[in-house]
Amino acid sequence: MMKVLVVVALLVTLISYSSSEGIDDLEADELSSLMANEQTRKECIPKHHECTSNKHGCCRGNFFKYKCQCTTVVTQDGEQTERCFCGTPPHHKAAELVVGFGKKIFG
């Protein structure tokens, strides 16, 4: 009976040690993921800034991520170029207006 208790205690110790190693690995992966997200957040393009070279790099606004909005610009030479900036699309502006109005009414 004593041998069985020793073996069970040994198994419980091994299982708890291996699970704590797994948890440490998960925490390390989660920490590196959070650090990568923070780095991309720092590198995002703010509202009204040019996003011609990185159309998916706009920052988040209050409720939605800004969208890269492009227009065609004709230079004095008659050359057409595309210029883009990060901004809030009209349907997102409308949603933010409704939410802001709702907050004022319902507190």
UniProtKB/Swiss-Prot annotation:
Residues 21-41 form a propeptide. GO terms for molecular function: toxin activity. Keywords: Disulfide bond, Knottin, Secreted, Signal, Toxin. Expressed by the venom gland. Residues 1-20 form the signal peptide. Transmembrane segments: none annotated. This is U1-lycotoxin-Ls1b. It comes from Lycosa singoriensis.
